[in-house]
Amino acid sequence: MDAKLSSTGGEAQTEQRQPGPVFVRNSRDADVPAMLAIYLHHIRRGVDPGIEENEFETPDAEDLKRRRKSMQRRKMPHILAEDGGVVVGYAYAVPFRKRPAYRYTVKHSIYVHNDHLRHGVGRQLMGALIDACAAAGFRQMIGYIDSANRASLALHEAFGFGKVGYLPSVGFKFGRWTDTVMVQRSLGPGATEPPRT
C-alpha cells in the first residue's frame, strides 16, 4: 500500500491510489452530504425499533462540517474512499483524551456505505488512516468495537491491533446487552522513543 503523505498548511494530505477503482483522499466540504448519509444509515441501523430519532442526537451537515474542520485544524486525519467519484466510505481520528498527556494517542472510526461492505473499502481506509496518523506524529491508535462485529475485529487484527480491554454489557440494543472490545496498535516507533515535540 503506497500512500503519498505531505504536509501543507499544517494538514496532512493523503492521496492513495489502490489497485482497482477505489481512491482514498482527504475529505472536503463538498463530501459532507455523502458522508452524513453513510453515518446516519449506520446510526439508524444500530438503534432499536421504537426509539424515535429525537431521542438520540444526529448531526446535520453543518455539524459534520464543523467537526471535520476542527479535526483538520488539530492535524487529525479525516479521509474518504471514492469509487468512480462516489463516496463509498470515510474514516477519521480524534484525540483519545482531552488532557495534554494523551496528545500522542488517537481513537478512530471508519464508516463504509452499506452497498460497499465486504469489498475492501474498510481495509483501504484503515491502511490510509494508520499511515496518516503515523505521519502526523501520533504514537498509539485506539478503537472500540462491538464484540459481535466479527468483520471489524478481524480487520483490526489484520492491521496489527491487539485486544487490550473488554467492556461487558455497556450497550443495550435489539433486546440484548452488548459488549465492547477495546483494541490498540502502535504507530511509528510507538513507545520505544520519546515523541518529537
Positions of the model-derived regions?
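Conserved GNAT acetyl-CoA-binding A-motif
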Residues: C133-I145
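Glycine-rich phosphate/pyrophosphate-binding loop shared by adenosine-nucleotide-utilizing enzymes
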Residues: V22, V86-Y90, T178
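Acetyl-CoA-dependent GNAT
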Residues: K4-S7, F56-D115, M126-G127, S186-L187
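Acyl-donor-binding surface of acyltransferase catalytic domains
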Residues: M1-Q18, V164, R185-L187
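Conserved acetyl-CoA-binding loop-helix of GNAT-fold acetyltransferases
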Residues: R118-A132, R150, A154-A158
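Conserved catalytic-core motifs of GNAT/GCN5-like acyltransferases
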Residues: Y92-P95, I142-I145, E157, G162-D179, ...
